[in-house]
Regions:
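Short acidic, Gly/Ser-rich segments with clustered Asp/Glu that frequently serve as metal-coordination loops
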Residues: 17-22
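A cross-domain feature marking catalytic cores of carbohydrate-active enzymes
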Residues: 15, 49-52, 128
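A short glycine-rich beta-strand->turn/loop micro-motif centered on a GG-aromatic cluster
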Residues: 100-103, 123-136
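Short Gly/Thr/Asp-enriched flexible loops that form oxyanion-binding sites at enzyme active sites
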Residues: 110-120
Length: 139
């Protein structure tokens, strides 16, 4: 599949303070996410940043938050980002066809987001070297 940047949107999923220290390969994932985010910014791809229950899990980790602070942030209480009404409206308002997805935890929130986006008619690109979970088997 070829990605046209004019048709693409980036969805960052739950890379948050209180969860991130417990995931596998966190240093490598953080480095990869920084590289991905910087590259997508150069290409002017719009971003949506999602955070699961900020009161309990915290905000996006500082190294990434610094890079994405100007983009919309949406708090969610569902596993899927695409079950949150504000996120759905924001994604639909962009008229983008392709959603690039990265974040944590791969087997829950990232997976549910991808499945719901596919069901919603979007093409999904999962950046696997920018996804992780607490257990290696779930990554």
């Amino acid at each position: 599949m070829r990605i046209n940047v004019e048709d693409a949107l980036f969805c960052l999923v739950d890379v948050q303070d209180k969860l991130y220290p417990h995931v596998t390969n966190k240093d490598e994932i953080e480095k990869n996410l920084i590289t991905l985010i910087k590259g997508l910014k150069v290409l002017s791809v719009p971003f949506i940043v999602n955070e699961q229950y900020k009161k309990g899990i915290g905000e996006t980790i500082p190294s990434l938050n610094e890079l994405v602070k100007e983009y919309p942030h949406f708090e969610k209480t569902t596993f899927s980002c695409y079950k949150n009404e504000e996120t759905i409206e924001a994604i639909n308002a962009t008229d983008k066809k392709v959603v690039i997805v990265a974040g944590i935890e791969t087997h829950v929130c990232v997976l549910q987001t991808c499945l719901d986006l596919l069901e919603g008619g979007y093409e999904v690109v999962l950046v696997t070297d920018c996804c992780t979970s607490r257990k290696q088997n779930d990554t």
